[in-house]
Amino acid sequence: MKKSFLILVSFIFSVSLMAQEKTTPVSDVNALKSEMQQSASKIKTISSDFTQEKFMSVMASKMVSKGKFYYQKEDKVTLQYLTPFKQNLVMNGTKLMMEANGKKNVLDATSNPMMAELKKVISACMGGNIASMGSDYKLEFFQTGGLYLIKIYPQSVNIKKVAEMVDLYLDKKDFSVVKMKMLEPLKKGQKTNDYTEYIFENKKFNSPIDASVFSIK
């Protein structure tokens, strides 16, 4: 179960560390949250291409994967990895399925509070309903160029075990997720600088998605 959970974290989270770009604080956070919620209320489905880049300090180079991303309100998320290997991550209601090499592993979020929180984070981020994350997360809002940057700091001890921070980059035009990143948790009190980054491209909104995409069997 622990191994499966760590695999889940690697699948779900990602980020873009744009440290070289200047960011400025958002002056009216409440207005931004309101705009985000209005935009999110209009979104029923999202489909896009994605690129995942995983950096680990013990590796000589980044591990790059590509695939298809699907989201359906309220709580259905699928990542279909196409290269270099075919594998799937499906979140549907309280269930989560990881499929690779012809083998499936189905987990129940209701039996694992940590997994339930991670599911809430990914659904809130993808659906644009950041306000639903509640007091277990500290949020900071910035802007840079044509993007908003939301820094998400988990306050829950459980979540801190798997993520030190999440950076979420939103397109100012439609508040859709452009990039998303997770910084790995501290190890022995020290930062690892390890992270996973997702880049979302060719997004389509409110297009029909076949129910089989979110099927868990």
Q: Model-predicted segments: where are they?
A:
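Gly/Pro-enriched, hydrophobic low-complexity segments
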Residues: 130-217
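Extended beta-sheet lipid-handling architectures
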Residues: 48-50, 64-66, 91, 152, ...
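Sec-dependent N-terminal signal peptides
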Residues: 4-14
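Positively charged n-region of N-terminal signal peptides that target proteins for export
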Residues: 1-4, 19-20
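Flexible, membrane-facing loop/turn or short amphipathic-helix motifs
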Residues: 55-62, 187-191
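Flexible, processing/modification-adjacent segments and terminal tails
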Residues: 21-25, 37, 41-42, 54, ...
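A short, Trp-centered hydrophobic/proline-enriched beta-strand micro-motif
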Residues: 39-57, 78
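An acidic-aromatic
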Residues: 21-22, 68-120, 196
